Amino acid sequence: MENNKVDVEQSLQLINNMIQKAKANFTDNGHGWLIWGTMIFMASLSTYFFIEYNFPNIFLAWNIFGGIAILLLLYNFFKPSHSKARSYVSDILKYVDIGFAVCLFVIIFSINVSVGPNNGFGYLLMIYAFLMLIQSGALQFKPLLYGAIINWIGSMAIFLNTELKYDMLITAVAVFLGYIIPGLILRSQYNKEMATSKQNVEL
């Protein structure tokens, strides 16, 4: 009977250790959210002003964003990992990122051939929100959950709206609140954790 009690305690301790290890593996310095958020924010605002002032190529900023995005995604997928530790959850999240990238390009393709930009950007915000929801669960980080909700609301607002220039403003606001602000919070938390770890090592 006593051995069974010890086994149960050891099992619970093992599970707890695995959970803590998993949490440690999913730290995020916020740089990715800031980079992507800033690019989308700038592309959206640029497009708004291009439309407002009758610029001949209103999607110039998005074309530039698309080229940079392809390079960043390729780098992210093929860069060597500095950590040898792998987990079931990290493998799943890698496939989620791949699926997100594929959906992103399918939506962009549809904007160019059939759906049109007025609805297409609504679908983009919808897929952004889906990624935020998953990452908020992996990181146990509420601001990304709030960002997901904001982006879903933004996508519905775009579907209700009929003018592309206002779609761009909605996208800019949704991305600022959903990407950039959580990214700044994550970076601040990460810097504090690194400073604390450095102090502990020095002690």
Regions found by a protein language model. Give the residues of each.
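N-terminal juxtamembrane cytosolic/stromal segments of multi-pass membrane proteins
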Residues: 1-29
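Selected alpha-helical membrane-embedding segments in polytopic membrane proteins
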Residues: 23-109
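Lipid-exposed faces of alpha-helical membrane segments in multi-pass integral membrane proteins
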Residues: 35-42, 64-71, 102, 127-130, ...
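Membrane-helix interface and helix-disruption motif detector
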Residues: 53-61, 112-120, 163-170
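Membrane-interfacial segments
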Residues: 54-55, 81-84, 114, 189-197
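Terminal transmembrane helical module of multi-pass membrane proteins
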Residues: 134-203
